Structures are given as structure tokens and as C-alpha cells.
Regions:
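RNase H-like nuclease fold core
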Residues: 1-70, 74-86, 178-179
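Amphipathic alpha-helical transducer elements in NTP-driven molecular machines
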Residues: 3, 42-49, 62, 70-77, ...
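A broad detector of the eukaryotic-type serine/threonine protein kinase catalytic domain
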Residues: 39, 53-56, 60, 118, ...
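Short, well-ordered secondary-structure micro-motifs
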Residues: 79-80, 105, 161-162
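Inter-helix linker motif
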Residues: 85-103
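Conserved phosphate-handling catalytic cores of large alpha/beta enzymes
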Residues: 98-127
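Acidic/histidine-rich catalytic cores and adjacent linkers
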Residues: 122-249
Length: 249
């Protein structure tokens, strides 16, 4: 494809007991593009890898540096390195992280956790990470599972901060809401479905609903700042190519 996809969102949707992984791209102009689907969960390494390999087979170059925005799946994270290389920046979904942490805390601690974590996300990467490590140390005493959840993949919660992107763009690139919002459209279209017969049925409904929704896609919030992301990705790719040339002699 000649479309310059800068961002790839990948997240899983659930229909009854069946799962579908979805990939949506954002080009340099902020326009969204449905890239592909695969039946299965993001936690399934084989399924995650197959989806990404299918994207490259259909024209998404594995040599262009991109920002990947994903849920917290370790299998999906590994698949990105395997298919597209370890040099691509990866942003873990902040909403997934927040929900996971809250799941380990009693309700009377939810407000404090939300305000602390969200405040840290507004800081520079190093300062924000330090704040959350400090909070995790406090949680460790009585809620070790919450502390462990918070610290898991902590650095990749701040990838967009390290890239120096403005807050308006970070709000869109910090979560997989872009896919979650499309999932709402899928749920609306499939509201009358009372029984999901199999994974193939879930996959077909997802593809049809996304295809219909794609016609009404709007550009992402903060799209006017995407040139900054493109510049950072291009610079990183040039530096890497230069390093490889020097190494090759």
C-alpha cells in the first residue's frame, strides 16, 4: 500500500465466548483504515502473529517504523517484535492498565488510584514512571497484586510521552479506544443476535460492521500534530539505517 500508516492499533473484541482481534491503522493525515481481523484472542501468540503476518502480506511494509498501540497482551507484544522488528515503539493502552489495577483494589481506593495514575500520565516520561513506581511501593504493603499489575510494562505506558507528542495527540494515542468505539458500533448492529454460533460468525459480523462504520470514520483527534510523530519515526528509522551501514563497514 502507498498509504503511509504511522499508527497501528490492535485490540481484541469479545462476542459471547468468541474473540476477534482487530487492527486499525492511522495514516499521516489522521485518517483511519481498517487493516484486518482474525478470529481468536490477543493472548494467543499464534493468532496474534498470523494477523500481523497477514497485514504484511497485504501490503503493510514491515520496514517502515510505526507506533503500535495495543492492549496488555504479552503474546501480541512478542508478535510485533517477531513480524515488524524490535525497533518499533509500542504504547500500551492506559485504559486497560487502569482497569487491571482497579480490579485488584477495593472500591474505596478506586478514586485515589485513578487520580494518581492519570496525573502521572500527564508528566514527562521519567517523572511519570517515578511517580507510579512510588505509588506501587505504597500499594505493595497491602495490595501486592495491584502493585505488580501497575509495574508490568510500565515503560511502555509512557512511549508517547518519550516521543514528545502534544497532549491532544497523546489522548488519542494512549488508548485503544479507537477500536473500542468501533466495537460499540458492532454491538449495536448485532444487538438482535442472541446466540453466537461459532467464531466464524463473530468474525463475519465484525468485518461487516467495521466495513459499514469505516465510511463514517473521522480523522483522529490531534491529527494536525501527526507530523511530529512522523518526524520522530522517520528520524529513528534513518538513525537505525545509518547504524546498520556503519556496522556493515
Amino acid at each position: 500500500s502507498e498509504t503511509d500508516i504511522l499508527v497501528v492499533y490492535v485490540d481484541g473484541l469479545q462476542f459471547g465466548k468468541y474473540h476477534v482481534i482487530c487492527a486499525v491503522g492511522v495514516d499521516a493525515g489522521g485518517h483511519k483504515h481498517v487493516l484486518g481481523f482474525r478470529e481468536g484472542a490477543t493472548e494467543n501468540a499464534e493468532v496474534a502473529t498470523a494477523l500481523l503476518e497477514d497485514l504484511t502480506a497485504r501490503g503493510l511494509s514491515p520496514f517502515r517504523r510505526r507506533l503500535f498501540v495495543i492492549d496488555g497482551s504479552k503474546a501480541l507484544r512478542k508478535a510485533i517484535d517477531q513480524v515488524f522488528g524490535k525497533e518499533n515503539p509500542v504504547q500500551r493502552c492506559r485504559n486497560h492498565k487502569l482497569r487491571n489495577v482497579l480490579g485488584h483494589l477495593p472500591k474505596d481506593q478506586h478514586d485515589q488510584a485513578k487520580s494518581t495514575i492519570k496525573a502521572a500520565f500527564k508528566l514527562g516520561a521519567d517523572e511519570g514512571i517515578a511517580k507510579l513506581k512510588q505509588y506501587a511501593s505504597w500499594l505493595e504493603r497491602d495490595r501486592p497484586s495491584a502493585a505488580a499489575s501497575l509495574l508490568d510494562g510500565l515503560d511502555e505506558l509512557f512511549t508517547i510521552n518519550r516521543l514528545g507528542l502534544p497532549s491532544q495527540l497523546r489522548r488519542c494515542l494512549g488508548t485503544t479506544n479507537l477500536i473500542d468505539n468501533s466495537h460499540s458500533a458492532v454491538r449495536q448492529r448485532s444487538a438482535r443476535v442472541k446466540h453466537w454460533r461459532d467464531g466464524t460468525m463473530a468474525l463475519r459480523w465484525t468485518a461487516a460492521s467495521f466495513a459499514a462504520s469505516e465510511q463514517n470514520f473521522r480523522r483522529i483527534m490531534g491529527h494536525q500534530h501527526l507530523w511530529m510523530l512522523k518526524a520522530a519515526l522517520d528520524e529513528f528509522q534513518q538513525d537505525q539505517q545509518l547504524a546498520q551501514q556503519i556496522k556493515a563497514g
